[in-house]
């Protein structure tokens, strides 16, 4: 049980809050309790303010033990106000924990938090910490953050994954291009575009001209047929075979057939094949998730917006009903 780690601290905080509550009642004030949380990579700073007065602050770990302590503190008050600055993946766990336990919260992006605190004349050199976040809530009275359905978060995660894979593909293409300049640069002219399943399979089969010239015409034709999963006519095969031989005769390879550069060329071609397949899988998942959403068909009806763009827009904007 995690309660054994938090009992003493929670009891102390509860006593402090009770004292402040009694003082507030004596003055006829309504008690407001604000939890300001400054989230870092490993831990978070928590500041608890009652009617603008700090009653407690501590550091908690960003794990089950730390969150259990926070939960114990939250349970000691009625309708606590929780405010924290979004710090990317680091604040994601805190947000998930609060969602799971049904607590409303206000999540600020870093620029928004800085702008708001600047307007309150907090010195720009001051670090935006938990206490400042909590203190500003008594002045700004921010609304709680709209909690989207899980499907929108999943779409955002898939959209970011798709973007990362696209960046990986661009890097791998650049590396393949550089390696081919040493072994067989003419091969980039075999198809209309040096990209796609057939091109990468041809690169794997023929990383330098020797692999072309060592084959008979029939063997070369068969390799070309195997380079694509699509149907390819005999005329097209013959054309590519003749062109491949011409490019090989034109080429001068800067390395020997046993050079590790050929292994590098094949590696990047295989990696591009794998990355492209994975990216298509992610896109299919995005489309499957987005199709039931009403905004999906609306976005597709706009000229120039296809499936990839539509799903990415939904992933980045989220549920537009929150605006």
Regions found by a protein language model. Give the residues of each.
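A detector of single, family-specific signature residues
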Residues: 1-323
């Amino acid at each position: 049980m995690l309660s054994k780690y938090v009992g003493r601290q929670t009891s102390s905080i509860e006593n402090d809050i009770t004292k402040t509550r009694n003082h507030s009642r004596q003055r006829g004030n309504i008690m407001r309790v604000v939890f300001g949380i400054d989230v870092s990579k490993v831990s978070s700073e928590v500041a608890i303010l009652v009617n603008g007065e700090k009653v407690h602050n501590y550091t908690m770990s960003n794990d089950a033990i730390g969150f259990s302590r926070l939960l114990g503190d939250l349970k000691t008050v009625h309708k606590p106000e929780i405010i924290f600055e979004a710090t990317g993946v680091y604040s994601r766990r805190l947000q998930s924990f609060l969602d799971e336990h049904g607590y409303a919260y206000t999540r600020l992006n870093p620029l928004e938090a800085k702008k708001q605190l600047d307007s309150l004349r907090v010195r720009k050199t001051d670090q935006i910490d938990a206490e400042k976040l909590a203190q500003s809530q008594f002045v700004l009275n921010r609304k709680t953050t709209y909690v989207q359905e899980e499907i929108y978060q999943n779409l955002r995660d898939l959209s970011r994954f798709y973007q990362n894979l696209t960046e990986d593909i661009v890097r791998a293409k650049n590396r393949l291009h550089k390696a081919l300049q040493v072994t067989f640069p003419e091969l980039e002219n075999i198809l209309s575009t040096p990209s796609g399943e057939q091109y990468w399979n041809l690169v794997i089969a023929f990383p330098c001209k020797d692999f072309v010239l060592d084959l008979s015409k029939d063997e070369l034709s068969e390799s070309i047929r195997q380079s694509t999963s699509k149907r390819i006519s005999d005329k097209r095969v013959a054309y590519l075979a003749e062109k491949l031989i011409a490019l090989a005769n034109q080429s001068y390879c800067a390395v020997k057939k046993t050079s590790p550069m050929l292994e590098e060329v094949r590696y990047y071609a295989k990696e591009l094949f794998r990355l492209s397949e994975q990216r298509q899988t992610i896109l299919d998942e995005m489309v499957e998730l987005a199709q039931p959403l009403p905004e999906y068909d609306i976005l597709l009806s706009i000229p120039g917006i296809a499936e990839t763009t539509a799903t990415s827009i939904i992933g980045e904007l989220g549920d537009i009903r929150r605006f």
